[in-house]
């Protein structure tokens, strides 16, 4: 092996000798006696003997009854494959960062590939995980039609699968209770209508992600149910679902179209399936100067949403934090439990936390919101949501 120039004072002689011995054994590729190792390395025989005994003791070498030494095949490091939703989505990147950190702490090799919010790419990523023979796949992709294709390819190779936030066949589900997080968002919107507009509402707009399937769509279902529960007088025609696809640009366009078609609506509630879609709605509201006519609640609690909630007069009144910082440790624990043959629930829900703009803007906001207990048993404060 080529050696780069280095100050001899930085070298550890006995460690260099141990590496020389290992290189000889690797080069020969067969068991060798002490004498051969001594001759090939020119290291004193007593030193060779002591190094060999140390390497045997630590499990790097085996010593056979006939006096030969051989390299022990080290167990392969457990490897997880993670198909992240999209490198341009803040929540996806927060989950990825959490998972990377947790994998390092657990000694897990983590291969991260980007699904790019695209079903064809997600299928290709799944094929790559199969080719690399990972021990377990954690899949975070949005398309319900790609889900069975991805799941079948992974299951055909006998690889366990965890699906994040969007269910997949053959997979253990991990993520939020979509209906409940939607219900929390809707309850806050209804409270805002009661306190600000005396309970009067002209329209309730749900920004859906149709491509993600019925479970993710239940976020909007939950929002509508919460609003109907508190504002029982609202007519069914007041509730409108449109597909923002979880994308800012599309959401901005369709919300702008809706507001132009309803110029007399002065009390509009918007529940967004994710913050990215909600921020698109906010863009449209500002461009049309309708800030005083609208209230928005999102999902994920990304940093831009937190910043918006700090802004006085913003129509953004809250976001449900899915606690992305907790995803990594919980996913690693779940993956290891699956590989160890433990019985795990088919649905594994993470905790969520409603973050309200009125609390963030209040003095000593961090004291106003009590800490919560995360999945790893440590206490997390509002700053965890802000980092996510």
Describe the function of each predicted region:
Residues 144-180, 203, 302-311, 315:
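Flexible loop/hinge segments that line or gate small-molecule binding clefts
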């Amino acid at each position: 092996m080529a050696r780069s120039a280095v100050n001899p004072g930085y070298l550890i002689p006995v460690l260099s000798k141990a590496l020389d011995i290992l290189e000889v054994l690797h080069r020969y590729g067969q068991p060798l006696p002490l004498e051969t190792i001594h001759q090939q390395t020119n290291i004193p025989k007593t030193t060779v003997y002591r190094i060999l005994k140390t390497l045997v003791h630590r499990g790097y070498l085996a010593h056979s009854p006939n006096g030969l030494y051989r390299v022990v095949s080290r167990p392969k490091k457990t490897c997880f494959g993670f198909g992240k939703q999209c490198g341009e989505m803040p929540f996806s990147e927060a989950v990825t960062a959490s998972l990377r950190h947790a994998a390092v702490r657990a000694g897990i090799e983590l291969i991260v590939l980007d699904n790019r919010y695209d079903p064809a790419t997600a299928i290709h990523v799944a094929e790559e995980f199969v080719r690399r023979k990972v021990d377990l796949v954690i899949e975070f992709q949005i398309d319900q039609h790609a889900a069975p294709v991805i799941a079948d390819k992974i299951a055909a190779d006998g690889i366990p699968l965890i699906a994040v936030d969007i269910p997949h066949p053959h997979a253990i589900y991990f993520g939020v209770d979509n209906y409940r997080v939607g219900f929390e968002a809707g309850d806050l919107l209804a409270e805002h209508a009661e306190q600000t507009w005396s309970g009067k509402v002209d329209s309730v707009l749900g920004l859906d992600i149709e491509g993600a399937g019925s479970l993710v769509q239940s976020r909007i279902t939950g929002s509508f149910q919460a609003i109907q529960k508190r504002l029982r007088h609202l007519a069914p025609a007041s509730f409108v679902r449109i597909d923002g696809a979880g994308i800012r640009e599309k959401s901005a366009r369709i919300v702008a179209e809706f507001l132009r078609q309803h110029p007399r609506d002065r009390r509009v509630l918007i529940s967004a399936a994710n913050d990215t879609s909600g921020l698109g709605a906010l863009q449209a509201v500002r461009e049309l100067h309708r800030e005083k006519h609208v209230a928005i609640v999102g999902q994920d609690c990304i940093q831009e949403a937190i910043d918006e909630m700090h802004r006085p007069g913003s129509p953004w009144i809250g976001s449900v934090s899915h606690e992305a910082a907790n995803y990594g440790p919980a996913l690693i624990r779940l993956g290891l439990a699956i590989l160890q043959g433990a019985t795990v629930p088919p649905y594994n829900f993470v905790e969520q936390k409603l973050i309200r703009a009125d609390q963030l803007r209040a003095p000593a906001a961090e004291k106003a919101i009590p800490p919560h207990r995360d999945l790893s048993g440590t206490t997390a404060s509002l700053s965890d949501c802000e980092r996510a």
